[in-house]
């Protein structure tokens, strides 16, 4: 019975930086109001909630809960508005525990690097 043990999916963690690698939330350039994330479902776009953690990183909790491939649109209100899409592929965990896992995340139209489960996004 899967209900006794359940593993929630890991969140997507993004750190928004400039070309020097400086965290733009930490240095005060960007705040929560500068970000918008939308889940793309056919012709519909649905706002997706996120938070900013104590390490000045954007945390998206929802993507891993959806099995299959889900595309999101991100809007970052920097001096030049940045639009980019990212696609999350998630699958069910195998074994006796229920839950999902994120298999991979791919970014389009933006420079992104993955390190230790954190996606560093270069926006200026």
Show the residue positions of the predicted features.
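Bacterial Sec-dependent N-terminal signal peptides
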Residues: 1-13
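Short amphipathic, basic-aromatic surface patches that mediate peripheral association
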Residues: 16-26
């Amino acid at each position: 019975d899967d209900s006794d043990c359940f593993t929630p999916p890991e969140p997507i963690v993004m750190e928004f930086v400039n070309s020097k690698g400086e965290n733009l939330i930490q240095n005060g350039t960007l705040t929560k109001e500068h970000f918008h994330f939308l889940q793309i479902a056919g012709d519909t776009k649905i706002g997706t909630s996120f938070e900013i953690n104590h390490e000045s990183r954007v945390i998206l909790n929802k993507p891993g809960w959806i099995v299959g491939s889900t595309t999101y649109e991100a809007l970052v209100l920097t001096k030049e508005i940045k639009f980019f899409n990212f696609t999350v592929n998630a699958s069910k965990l195998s074994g006796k525990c229920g839950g999902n896992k994120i298999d991979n995340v791919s970014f389009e139209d933006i420079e992104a690097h993955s390190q230790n489960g954190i996606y560093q996004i270069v926006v200026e």
